[in-house]
Regions:
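C-terminal outer-membrane beta-barrel translocator/porin domains of Gram-negative envelope proteins
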Residues: 238, 394, 398-401, 405-529, ...
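Short beta-strands and strand-coil junctions in structured, solvent-facing domains, enriched
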Residues: 105, 120, 160, 165, ...
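C-terminal structured "cap/appendage" subdomains that terminate the fold
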Residues: 542, 546-568, 579
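Sec/Tat signal peptide C-region and signal peptidase I cleavage site
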Residues: 13-17
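Outer-membrane beta-barrel domain signature
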Residues: 58-59, 141-145, 161, 173-175, ...
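Bacterial N-terminal signal peptides that target proteins for export
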Residues: 1-5
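Gram-negative/organellar outer-membrane beta-barrel architecture
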Residues: 123-124, 227-430, 447, 494-498, ...
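Periplasmic polypeptide-binding modules associated with outer-membrane biogenesis and secretion
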Residues: 18-32, 36, 45-300, 304, ...
Length: 593
């Protein structure tokens, strides 16, 4: 009986020990200091810990003032008053932390000493600009985090251009609690200047070196630049030839030469102010040459989709990309050949395609061959292309037609975005001009121009306005003989929502066909209630017609959901088409240009 009673009494004590001592902590501190203390004091971190008992709590109460003083000093408060009280009278112990931070310590003076930076008459390093960029100015609150960040930023500004061996040789912050001032001194030694040497390539087996060399804009003798290395590496990653790319300065060569230099210094030879040219090392792992992939999907524009693609990275020293795509409203087979980027930065390609479309009562069958030259950067892309297109058209309620054409087109795209994948500020503009102006393989001569743009205007981090527009015009003696590919229609996910894909255009028989002119516009408001989730309201309007006077805009409006997925922004919209008086679901991934 006595043993049973002991077991009953011991059970709650064992449970209590397993859970740890439960107590309350209340922190009274101004501003954000309460969050600082709550996130770092042992009193808070070890609350409920199975190993925490009353004696350990008392010890943490005794050490809490010193710990709080250390934490407050990181925010510039070096003379705080911290009072910690433990009340054990209740069922659960209560700890109260009262903090009076006092006046913060301010930056009193800043002394920056820059050593090295060997004189270069051609392009001397701007030491005054480096000093002026120091962010921790006199009179600011001296915070430990800001102090460390300022030193890292200054060192980073030096090592990423010209002087990758730079280092801080002195870093002192002298704090006077009486005057509430911090005296700062930083000394930085640049080390020797570095320039790039010849390129060294490792890892190539199947593909020609020209793929890498033609993308390299770093010349022997150029000053070291981390940004140049990253840009070169990014270009190589985008080629599709490599599964892994690393572009660096060959420091192994540098170390060997430095060891030789140190041996000379020990013999009384002075150290050089600059390093010998450092080889540019490119290490790659090649992608497999051939790749076959299958895909299925669905589009609210063209319905269910099945596709098979075949890529070959080295056929006649060219890259082949081919695909067969079968959708409910569109079927297409194409093969494109890509030349390696030239030394002048040109990307040349040619190919051919067979395509069948069944859109709004109009069935078109096209065969085309084409060639293209593109150049530029993601900020400014340009291209010129030529295409021979042979097309037959069957229209419900009208006779069939045949057309062929050989147009040339110049296109340019301007981008100024804060983020290329998830833009929240900036714009993209695209314009094209071209046509078939010679009577060669062309049934009807024409001139065609288009312009489209999208603008992102943030109101604040959670609220965003998006404006989109597109216009197009085609000039010809007659529309007959002009392939429908070059005419204009509107409606669909990335056009006027609330209408079917290319539903808006010119009525011909029982079908909707393309017109000579196009005008669409859209305004959208987005609210991001979470970092990756948002909602939208929008209003779209537009139409296509054979004359400007016949463009009577059709409107659509509705609500949508937005999601920032790993592959890009996903948009799901429900739009009401005012002219057709019914709602339609739209789904799109990202934006189209």
């Amino acid at each position: 009986m006595r043993l049973a009673c002991a077991a009953v009494l011991a059970a709650p004590l064992a449970l209590y020990a397993a859970e740890g001592l439960q107590y309350n902590v209340r922190i009274n501190a101004p501003g954000d200091l309460d969050e600082l203390l709550e996130g770092n004091l042992d009193l808070v971190k070890y609350r409920g810990n199975p190993r925490t008992d009353l004696e350990q709590l008392r010890r943490m109460v005794r050490t809490a003032p010193a710990q709080a003083n250390t934490l407050l000093a990181t925010e510039g408060y070096y003379s705080p008053t911290v009072n910690v009280q433990l009340d054990e009278s209740g069922a659960r112990p209560q700890v109260t932390v009262d903090v009076t931070p006092g006046e913060p310590v301010l930056v009193g003076s800043v002394e920056i000493v820059l050593n090295g930076f060997a004189s270069n008459q051609e392009s001397p390093f701007d030491k005054e600009a480096l000093k002026a960029s120091w962010p921790l100015a006199e009179g600011q609150v001296f915070r430990q985090g800001d102090w460390e960040s300022a030193k890292r930023a200054m060192l980073r500004a030096v090592v990423q251009t010209r002087y990758p061996r730079a280092q801080l040789t002195e870093s002192v912050a002298t704090v006077d609690p009486d005057t509430k001032r911090a005296l700062l001194r930083v000394a930085l030694d640049s080390g020797p200047e570095m320039r790039f040497g010849e390129i060294k390539i490792e890892g190539l087996k199947r593909y020609p070196e020209e793929i890498i060399r033609n993308l390299n804009k770093i010349n022997p003798g150029d000053l070291y630049s981390e940004a140049a290395l990253q840009a070169f590496q990014s270009k190589l990653q985008d080629t599709g030839y490599f599964s892994y790319v690393e572009v660096t300065a060959d420091l192994n060569t540098l170390i060997g030469e430095r060891q030789e230099a140190q041996a000379e210094q020990s013999a009384g030879v002075p150290a050089p102010a600059t390093l010998p040219p450092v080889p540019l090392l490119v290490h790659v792992v090649e992608n497999k040459r051939k790749n076959v992939s299958l895909g299925v999907g669905f589009s609210t524009n063209t319905g269910g989709r099945t596709s098979v693609s075949y890529d070959d990275l080295a056929i006649w020293n060219l890259r082949l990309k081919s695909a067969l795509t079968v959708e409910q409203k569109k079927q297409k087979a194409n093969g494109d050949f890509y030349f390696p980027t030239t030394a002048n930065g040109y990307n040349d390609s040619f190919g051919g395609a067979l395509e069948r479309n069944d859109i709004e009562g109009e069935i078109t069958r096209t065969a085309s061959v084409y060639g293209k030259r593109a150049w530029g950067t993601p900020l400014l892309e340009r291209s010129i292309s030529a295409e021979y297109l042979n097309e037959s058209t069957s229209i419900s309620g009208a006779e069939s037609k045949h057309a062929m054409s050989l147009p040339f087109t110049y296109a340019v795209t301007w981008r100024k975005l804060d983020n290329l994948i998830f833009p929240t500020s900036g714009y993209v503009l695209n314009a094209t001009a071209g046509g078939a102006v010679l009577p060669i393989l062309t049934d009807e001569k024409f001139i065609r121009v288009t312009a489209r743009g999208i603008m992102y205007r943030p109101l604040n981090p959670k609220n965003l306005l998006i404006f989109r527009g597109e216009i197009g015009a085609l000039r010809s003696s007659s529309k007959d003989g002009v392939p429908t590919t070059y005419l204009f229609r509107a409606g669909g996910d990335n056009s006027v929502r609330g209408y079917a894909y290319q539903e808006l255009g010119v009525q011909e028989g029982d079908a909707t066909v393309g017109g000579r002119y196009l005008a669409t516009a859209s305004a959208e408001y987005q609210y991001w209630f979470r970092p990756t989730w948002g909602a939208a309201v929008f209003y779209d309007a537009g139409n296509a017609a054979d004359s400007l006077s016949d463009i009577h805009p059709k409107s659509g409006y509705g609500l949508g959901a937005r999601y920032k997925s790993p592959v890009g922004p996903i948009n799901v919209d429900v739009a009401y088409g005012h002219a057709v008086r019914k709602a339609r679901l739209h789904f799109s991934l990202g934006f189209t240009f």
